[in-house]
Amino acid sequence: MDRKRNIIVLLLDTVRAADARAGMPLLSGIARRATSYENAVSPATWTVPSHASMFTNMRASSIRQTARDFLATGSIDPWFTQVKFLPENAHTLAYNMARLGYTTTLFSNNPFLTSFTNLGAGFSRIYDLWIDSNGQYDRKLTRRFASILRGGERTRARMVAASVAVSRMMPKPMVDSVYLSLRKRLDRSVARADGTHRLDRGANATIHSMAEYIDRDYDFAPQFMFVNCIEAHENYPVQSRDTIQDKWLYLSGINELDEGTARMFHRGYMRRLGYLDRKLGAMVGMLKVKGMLDNTTLVITSDHGQFFGEHGLLYHSLFPYEEVTKVPLVAVNYDNGRMVADHERLDSNVSTSSLYRAILDIGSGKENHLNGNMKASKYAVSEHLGISEGWDGQLLSKLKDRSSVARKIYETKQKYNMRATAVYSGNMKLIHFFGDRKDELYDVAKDPRETTDIISAHREEAHRLLSAYRLSKPFVAV
């Protein structure tokens, strides 16, 4: 019997498809020689629901742990509240690969994708690289933050209560200036601690850890590796280190998100993509030297994209327009250490959650390669389940009556906390809003920037897409 293939997924967090093509020449070169899915759709608009969906092939809204209103509860961060994003007994992709005889290993630079959020369920080894990569540049500040986190939810409640009590002793005009000053100070402190103005956000450490794992612990069993690199995530290396990158100050109108500011952030993003592309080359080269590509399927993709002023939006975890829903998806097959030149370019809509079944098919021996045989999605779905930044919801709700700044941010967060679902079929895309905002319909082949809503002339098509979404089973590929 032939030996099972290694399967390695390199997930480049926050990389949007259009900019991957424009700013990552090595990835683009691989895509031309391998199999490239040109209309890959992320199942959700931020890390947690997207990974949860990819790991289970379930629609994100059907997973109770990821579909909560994090702004209302405040239970979003995995540190204070030790929140879980999948059930303890979830039969994840890693769990099922382990049952097929694979050694399953996770290398993560994302603090949500970790050993204690259950998104790592099923992996036999988890390298929480983010612990060092997200706090290596200001150890003193990191230690201070860690001491607060150890207090858990009780500590946060005390901090909120103390902040509100202090605000009540101030004149209202003073609350605004103090709150805004502290928020900007926090933004700069985080930037100083996590290397915002540097290019590397853990890629070098990831390559080192992967090489060390192969040298020390590789057991010659078939490998399923999942690697998350976070270089493309905000914040970004911009010219002035005093530049505020808090998206809620911009979305609320407190800071102006003009074209110059959006371009500045985008330039920083493209610098990171160029760096990430070079590290992708180094990672693939290391895997080849170590013999890990002798009989391997390599998948390169992302969990969501990023906004830079399009539709008046910034970053992600916002409404599902193309900039955040379309991601790169490239499958590369290696036989006897050499890349198989498939030269396939597929234009049909494919949800990245379809990787779940495609990878299991290779692991079980049903398929030998991933080269265009991944199931196209008749209706591909991308969901915005609400904003991810619910960490300060409780504080904002208590300060909003005394601070116009807090009120603006709180109301803006409420606005974008509205659920919305994008449903794709062929060239047509419906965005259905679960609130007091009208649905929108686009022909994304003719109008990829979604500038012209055509729903008034195509209501039957919009109804067809919405009905398909409502009637389908809670799996992403329907």
Give each language-model segment a name.
Residues 1-478:
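Catalytic domains that recognize anionic headgroups
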